[in-house]
Amino acid sequence: MLNKVFIIGRLTGDPVITYLPSGTPVVEFTLAYNRRYKNQNGEFQEESHFFDVKAYGKMAEDWATRFSKGYLVLVEGRLSQEKWEKEGKKFSKVRIIAENVRLINRPKGAELQAEEEEEVPPIEEEIEKLGKEEEKPFTDEEDEIPF
C-alpha cells in the first residue's frame, strides 16, 4: 500500500517541541494551504486549508529551530489517523507525519540563522527529486492468485 503526501504551505505559527519519556523530540506545527479556483461564474475564489503536521527525532528538532511562523515549506510524509474517546464520544483526526521538510522561502524580513546561510536549491529541483526512491524489482512471494 502507498501512503505518501507532498504539500507546500506556510507555517501558521512557530513549531512546538515536546519530548517523549524516552527523550525523543516531537515537533508539531500547522501548515496553511490556499487553493485558488474559478467558480461557476468564472470568478476567482480562494479557500484555505489547514493541516496538522507532526515529526519525530533529532531532524525534527532541527526543523523546529530553523523554521518559524510564515515560512513556506515543502513537507514530505505520510497520513496518520489518530483516534480517541472523550466523555463517551469517539473522535478521529488525520495528520501528516513528516519524513522530510524543506524550506522554500522565508517571509520578508526574516533573519537567517548561521546554518541557513547555505544556498537553497530552486524549488523545481526539489520537486523533481520528490518521490524518486531507489526502485526495487517486483517479486511475487506467492504463486497463488488471491481470487
UniProtKB/Swiss-Prot annotation:
SUPFAM superfamilies attached here? Nucleic acid-binding proteins
Q: What UniProt keywords are attached to this protein's entry?
A: DNA damage, DNA recombination, DNA repair, DNA replication, DNA-binding
Q: Where is this motif: Important for interaction with partner proteins?
A: 142-147
Q: Where is the composition biased (Basic and acidic residues)?
A: 128-139
Q: One GO molecular function term?
A: single-stranded DNA binding
Q: Which residues form the SSB domain?
A: 1-105
- The source's domain of life comes to Bacteria
Q: Region Disordered: start and end of each range?
A: 108-147
GO (cellular component) term, any one: nucleoid
Residue stretches of biased makeup (Acidic residues): 113-127
How does this chain assemble?
Homotetramer.
Identify this protein by name.
Single-stranded DNA-binding protein
